[in-house]
């Protein structure tokens, strides 16, 4: 006589549970694999993990030099930890009001965008604990056409007043995103530091110049031609630190006119980007051993 236990309700229920557990386990493994594969796109193997780049350098006064409102979104972690962990004095300069930007979503009249984005930048830097922030009036998208001597002189005067020992900015050949305004402000930053050293005054420049570096694999996949330009022209980073992704999400909420920028530019929503990209990467130039000529 055949054993009827195989058709018993309890036996059938047990089989279903076993099947569900197996399926769930496979899904967990697949999701975990996809997660770590995604994280690898934003990993930079040359970078050593540190709690704070500014703390690692012994910085006490930090100046960030940028081109547009929202550029500070690349360095949230560095500035937040410089203030909260290291007690550093922090300052920012943004060269343009971002008036030529594309609104994603549209939140204001286009003719008012410069005013709106200036306010967004000032509010975001305040949210990062930044002590002072100047937004200049140079044309968005036209920084390379501005008289370079004027830009350098203005930055020199600002640096003499702030006296930063760490300056944070863009690598001139890549600008983190390939934007020409970023690249020019990176060049102007180097020229200003060189001029301060040449003048040899009471304040003769910072001890370290820190460049924000973009993750190469992700840029190669999602950054298009500009991403390739960045990958081919930026140096490898020596340091990685927490990106303080909570502050990045807060920053995009503050930058309401650019809130959907990541999805618009790279086809990935911000929540997914920062789930995978939770570190900032930096190349550091020790100006005592490697001065700017």
PLM features: residue spans?
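Short aromatic-enriched loop/helix-cap "lid" or pocket-rim segments at secondary-structure transitions
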Residues: 102-106, 180, 220-225
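Active-site adenylate/phosphate-handling loop in enzymes that bind or generate adenylated species
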Residues: 159-196
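Histidine-centered active-site/metal-ligand motif
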Residues: 68, 179-182, 255
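The feature marks non-catalytic terminal segments
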Residues: 24-33, 199-293
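Active-site rim/loop-helix segments in enzyme catalytic domains that contact anionic ligands
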Residues: 11-23, 30-162, 190-199
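Short, well-ordered beta-to-alpha junction loops that form the rim of enzyme active sites
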Residues: 137-138, 169-173, 213-214
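N-terminal amphipathic/basic-hydrophobic helices that include classical n-h-c signal peptides
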Residues: 1-11
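Soluble non-cytosolic domains of exported or imported proteins
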Residues: 111-115, 145-150, 179-183, 239-246
């Amino acid at each position: 006589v055949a054993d009827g236990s195989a058709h018993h309700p309890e036996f059938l229920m047990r089989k279903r549970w076993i099947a569900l557990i197996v399926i769930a386990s496979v899904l967990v493994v697949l999701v975990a694999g996809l997660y770590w594969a995604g994280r690898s796109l934003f990993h930079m193997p040359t970078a050593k993990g540190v709690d704070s780049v500014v703390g690692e350098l012994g910085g006490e006064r930090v100046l960030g030099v940028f081109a547009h409102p929202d550029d500070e979104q690349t360095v949230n972690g560095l500035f937040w930890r410089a203030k909260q962990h290291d007690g550093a004095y922090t300052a920012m300069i943004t060269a343009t009001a971002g008036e030529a930007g594309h609104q994603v979503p549209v939140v204001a009249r286009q003719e008012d965008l410069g005013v709106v984005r200036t306010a967004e930048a000032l509010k975001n830097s305040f949210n990062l604990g930044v002590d002072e922030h100047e937004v200049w009036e140079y044309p968005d998208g036209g920084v390379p056409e501005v008289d370079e001597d004027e830009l350098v002189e203005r930055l020199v005067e600002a640096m003499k007043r702030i006296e930063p020992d760490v300056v944070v900015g863009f690598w001139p050949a890549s600008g983190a995103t390939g934007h020409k305004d970023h690249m020019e402000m990176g060049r102007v930053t180097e020229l200003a530091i060189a001029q301060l050293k040449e003048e040899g005054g009471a304040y003769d420049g910072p001890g370290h110049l820190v460049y924000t570096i973009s993750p190469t694999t992700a840029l190669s996949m999602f950054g298009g031609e500009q991403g390739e330009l960045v990958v081919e022209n930026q140096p490898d980073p020596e340091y990685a630190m927490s990106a303080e992704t909570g502050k990045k999400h807060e920053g995009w909420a503050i930058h309401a006119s650019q809130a959907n920028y990541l999805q618009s530019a790279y086809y990935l929503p911000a929540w997914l980007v920062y789930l995978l990209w939770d570190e900032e990467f930096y190349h550091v130039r020790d100006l005592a051993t490697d001065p700017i000529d």
